[in-house]
Regions:
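P-loop NTPase switch module centered on the Walker A-proximal segment
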Residues: 1-108, 114, 163, 205, ...
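P-loop NTPase catalytic nucleotide-binding module
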Residues: 1-19, 109-255
């Protein structure tokens, strides 16, 4: 029992409405092996059956109005995900949830950045010195400059930001991400996004295979931006993260 408790991790997923947190929750469940098919909130038919949006109002409006918890085993840990309501009308449920989790995953829209409800929920997390991980979503749509988003997070929320990965392109040109931690390039699989897919993995920025998947202009831009990231932004500090003073950020698309 002690071993089970030690390996249990509970995350609240917070965001402004429509930033994509329920869709992201579905993908965690999919890649964690808890479900076989993800149900996108904005999709149609079978694909629209979101596991966390189970109330009639939630299904009709495509939003979460109550916190719902989902669990799955991952490696040697037991993961609890709590999908919280983003709309301010239902924020009391979210506030209660935040008091019972180990850390929070803050989802932001790449085109909109920090929005009002995100800021409110972040401040509740800050009152508890809760560690926060950030996911910048919807990179497959037109989005703001990546450095601009990071600057806004740092200035608006007064927290250091350190990228864990970096997007390759954006909008219709979004191809995948460069993993800064493991020095790998992950090229997105554009097949059926409701089922688990295997991305193309390239070893580092100098692997000649990269030219097969990434156009020269995008590769040059990526190299320039990675150099700026390493020169201008802080490295990950575990102590600062645990105290709620630094957030690692990942870029990508929950779809």
């Amino acid at each position: 029992m002690n071993n089970l408790i030690e390996n249990r991790r509970t995350f609240a997923i917070i965001s402004h409405p429509d930033a994509g947190k329920t869709t992201l929750t579905e993908k965690f469940l999919l890649y964690g092996g808890a479900i076989q098919q993800a149900g996108q909130v904005k999709a149609k038919g079978e694909a629209r059956r979101s596991r966390s949006d189970f109330m009639t109002l939630e299904k009709e409006r495509g939003i979460s109005v109550s916190a719902s918890a989902m669990s799955f085993a991952y490696n040697e840990s037991w993961i609890n995900l709590v999908d919280t309501p983003g709309h301010s009308d239902f924020s009391e449920d979210t506030y209660r949830t935040i008091t019972a989790v180990d850390s929070a995953i803050m989802v932001i829209d790449g085109a909109k950045g920090i929005e009002s409800q995100t800021k409110k929920l972040f401040e509740v997390c800050r009152l508890r010195d809760l560690p926060i991980l950030t996911f910048c979503n919807k990179m497959d749509r037109e989005s703001r400059d990546n450095f601009e988003i990071i600057d806004e997070i740092q200035e608006t929320l007064t927290i250091d930001v350190t990228p864990m990965n970096w997007p390759i392109g954006s909008g219709s040109d979004f191809l995948g991400c460069y993993d800064l931690v493991n020095n790998k390039i992950n090229i997105m699989d554009r097949a059926d996004r409701n089922v688990r897919a295997t991305s193309i993995v390239i070893d580092g920025l100098n692997d000649p295979v990269i030219s097969k998947y990434v156009p020269n202009a995008l590769r040059k831009k990526l190299l320039e931006e990675i150099e700026m990231v390493k020169g201008l932004l802080p490295s990950f500090d575990h102590e600062m993260f645990n105290s709620g003073n630094m957030t690692p950020i990942w870029f990508g698309s929950a779809i």
